Amino acid sequence: EKVNMRQQNTWMCYQRKEEKNVRCADAATARPLSAQRLGSPMGNTLTAYTDKLCLIVETNGLKNVLHPLEKTDRYLWGSLSPDGNRILFTAVGKGTYVCDLKGKVLAEIGYLNAPVWYDRDRIVGMVDKDNGDYITSSSVVMVSADGKQRQILVPSTEKAMYPAVNRSSGRIAYNTLEGDIIVLELEK
């Protein structure tokens, strides 16, 4: 099902050719989003994100740089779990992991690029391959947050990339190399 994401009022993620990192924007306003924020009635905020290849947890405006893996300091795609207790991130050249808010690794997910939380127990990302010049295959995969279960949602022949999740509807959107945006609705 092809849908105009602006009409869906969901977050869109896209990659700019001149930059190496993924930018997210609110589809309704096109306002850039750099992080997820969870707020409580007391006004406290907790955010997890990556900036300049650093993994950062921000609590009420106070930033703390995490170093969950000893032999790397380059991180991408950091995000806070829906329950606010864990951080999902990719260590460049190492793989994707889940850690607690202090940086203790809780699970190794393995190779999964552009990972996003689907819900508190599942993650969606892409498993892509290239030949050095262009993408040769890319599938959208759902993985349990402990890394033990894996399910292919879109086969690699589709060259499905950069999944985005709308948690309230349970839908997953991804783009193809041709520029199409496809929306999946998972059976409950």
Tell me what each language-model feature is:
Residues 1-188:
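Sequence signature of WD/YWTD-type beta-propeller architectures
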